[in-house]
Amino acid sequence: MIQSPTSFLIVLVLLWCKLVISCFRECFVALHQLVQVLLQIINSNLQSRLLLWHSLD
């Protein structure tokens, strides 16, 4: 299957690139979920403050 060291290196580099891309994708998904959770927390916080503010009027 592998004839020379250069083709082996090419396969190695391609596999490494694939690994890096998948890691970046995982990190991106994790960051996206974290941002969504933070936005939900901020949103619920704002809603409770607005309710408190309206109840004081």
From Swiss-Prot:
InterPro entries listed in its UniProt record: IBV_3A (IPR005214)
Q: Where in this chain does the entry annotate a coiled-coil region?
A: none
Q: Which residues form the signal peptide?
A: 1-23
Q: Which biological process terms from the Gene Ontology are attached to this UniProt entry?
A: symbiont-mediated suppression of host innate immune response
Presence of the UniProt keyword Nucleus in the record: no
UniProt cross-references to Pfam families, sorted A to Z = IBV_3A
Q: Which UniProt keywords apply?
A: Host-virus interaction, Inhibition of host innate immune response by virus, Interferon antiviral system evasion, Signal, Viral immunoevasion
* Keyword Metal-binding appears in the UniProt entry: no
Instruction: State what this protein does.
Output: Involved in resistance to IFN.
The name this protein goes by in its record: Non-structural protein 3a
Species name: Avian infectious bronchitis virus (strain UK/68/84) (IBV)
